[in-house]
């Protein structure tokens, strides 16, 4: 960045996407300040690294700042945004700051409706073990490094590209990965899936002539846009038509294995510790990126074998009394189906107890019918009220109505518990040895999983 920029302020610095960029900037030597509505382990970490953290949004938080960075959740009436404009301090979206960091490196952007965080994390493990040492910005905590960002000494920047508000179009990556295209964030994409597909086409075609797009051929919406892709691309999938292909896929508990092929040539075996057929696809995207960067296949294998997972993606919270408690960020019907299918594949003999907190009224409303049929792999389902994420209620978009419709569509053991604080005690009365309890949602439901672990340990 131009030398006169010294201090950068983040409104909503505790967010997983904002904090990663803030940490990289701190490590680059910039002064960083930020505010959030409440403190967290993220804000505490940033404070230890030297950031000035304010709790609550107020004009006084802007002290000698040169630019203000905001997320899509921050509105124009935020007091810090109002003050910045009064002081004629530039206010930019998070994606624009990420684009500035990417401009200084060769960018690898992982996009797609689902699987971005896991794919980016896997790629970070592979490239790190290959000696490429990328700068990374991830939307989840990479277990191997204990954080969601790292300043590397290499020439690449590896980051998630968030499509939720279309701002990923400001990025200009050298390598662009698209894992899938699905209907989500319909509050922004009023034109539905066709507008979403159009936006991804624009994103892919921003790749330079010397770059590469990596696209999942198994995804029908990606197949639909292929004729409109103008840049060089590589495909991956289970399909025999894919450039990177997986065969002989095996699932054994947390371990997933498959044989990787490139354009008909057998590369070798891949194995990693993360369950689910969807993660086979995520892994193949990483293989494609690594091959494009001339990473030896032996280093790819090593990177996968050392992959330690990422926070809130099928994360074990504890196994007291023979009951496995897992937390997963899945909050879209497709993600829920994939997570529950992963549990069913890896542990076919176990009873699966799913605990779901819908995230956002708009998503619950727009995808209501898909949510109704998303839980068939769960033996027991508990729903709690919607995590609003700052939204106002939408008529009919309630967990109570969702539970009723799920029952009407043939699922038998469904319970609505509006107060999530009561869920751990309810679970204590129904779970038994051998069960797998999975908390699902992008809100606060992970806390109930942790509370259940504590209760089970106390009563063991």
Swiss-Prot record:
GO terms for cellular component: cytoplasm. The keyword ATP-binding applies. Pfam families: Mur_ligase, Mur_ligase_C, Mur_ligase_M. Signal peptide: none annotated. Its main location: cytoplasm. One of its GO terms (molecular function) is ATP binding. One of its GO terms (biological process) is cell division. Pathway: Cell wall biogenesis; peptidoglycan biosynthesis. Its EC number is 6.3.2.8. ATP binds at residues 112-118. It is found in: Cytoplasm. Keywords: ATP-binding, Cell cycle, Cell division, Cell shape, Cell wall biogenesis/degradation, Cytoplasm, Ligase, Nucleotide-binding, Peptidoglycan synthesis. The keyword Nuclease does not apply. It comes from the Bacteria. It catalyses: UDP-N-acetyl-alpha-D-muramate + L-alanine + ATP = UDP-N-acetyl-alpha-D-muramoyl-L-alanine + ADP + phosphate + H(+). Belongs to the MurCDEF family. Cell wall formation. This is UDP-N-acetylmuramate--L-alanine ligase.
